Design a protein with these regions (language model features):
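Nucleotide-activated chemistry modules centered on ATP-dependent adenylation/adenylyltransferase
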Residues: 1-262
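A short, hydrophobic C-terminal helix/tail in secreted or cell-surface proteins
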Residues: 263-267
Length: 267
């Protein structure tokens, strides 16, 4: 692997997906240390893709931290799994941090946001993601488990390396391992959030094959038949959220209660 200071990222074309992901992480780590003076931040949601990224960072032999954004709407099993994983990683000397959401300068939650927004999250109005899931990371180089295979939108909108700014039209994405990093990491751009998605081109089958072969700990909800472990009742889950509400009825009651509260506030 050869990485020119502001030029092309060169990763051999004939390496396997695991080694390719590790190579991407090493490039991101080098850029993080060089430009920010801080280790790469590996984010974890408690899902399978995050588990792959944490394991890959360990195999890459790079310095890194792990951060989790506490959404307040995750399943209890997910919260416990993240705590257990953080305890395991901290025993290995890896710094782990839980970030709590804020809104207008104050701590908040999904259940605090809905009354302020006067509407629960919908497929078209997902204010919750920005506040609860995507906060943090400014001025740092961040690793996520985003994959193109998750949705057509992600296949179109996400890259291997990214520079994210508030005006998304001005964001920069590198979609190929031979892409230039010059625009991505120009000194004037360092206040943006920089992201590496090392397994962005992996399939779901590749993710599960890696986890099983490597015996990496995974969220126990997968063993219960769930294929996603995000926020309970997320509108993007479609009809699957009704199964989630059956499994965790307290969440459905909260949404319904706050929905009626919001309606009453409009009257």
């Amino acid at each position: 692997m050869n990485n020119n200071e502001w030029g092309l990222v060169t990763i051999p074309a004939n390496i396997d997906p695991e080694q390719r992901a590790i190579a991407r992480l090493k490039i991101a780590s080098e850029m993080s240390l060089k430009n920010y003076g801080t280790p790469l931040v590996v984010t974890t949601s408690g899902g399978k893709d995050s588990s792959v990224c944490v394991e890959m960072a360990q195999r890459a032999g790079i310095p890194f931290e792990v951060q989790h954004n506490h959404t307040t709407a995750d399943a209890p099993e997910t919260v416990r799994f993240v705590r257990q994983e953080f305890a395991r990683l901290e025993n290995l000397g890896i710094k782990c941090t839980v970030n709590y959401p804020t809104y207008k300068g104050k701590r908040t939650s999904m259940w605090g946001l809905i009354p302020q927004k006067l509407i629960p999250p919908t497929r078209m109005v997902r204010y919750c993601c920005e506040v609860l899931k995507e906060h943090g990371g400014d001025g740092r180089f961040v690793c996520t488990g985003v994959r193109w295979g998750e949705s057509a939108r992600r296949a179109k909108m996400r890259g291997i390396f990214e520079k994210q700014v508030k005006d998304r039209d001005k964001s920069v994405k590198v979609h190929e391992d031979g892409g230039s990093l010059e625009e991505l990491f120009a000194p004037c751009k360092l206040k943006a959030k920089h992201i590496v998605n090392p397994i962005v081109d992996w399939t779901t089958s590749q993710v599960w094959d890696f986890l099983r072969d490597s015996k990496v700990p995974v969220n126990p909800l997968y063993e219960c038949g769930f294929d996603r472990v995000g926020c309970v009742g997320c509108p993007l889950a479609g009809k699957k959220r009704y199964r989630e509400f059956n499994y965790w009825p307290a969440y459905e009651k909260l949404y319904i209660c706050l929905l009626y509260t919001s309606d009453a506030a409009d009257d």
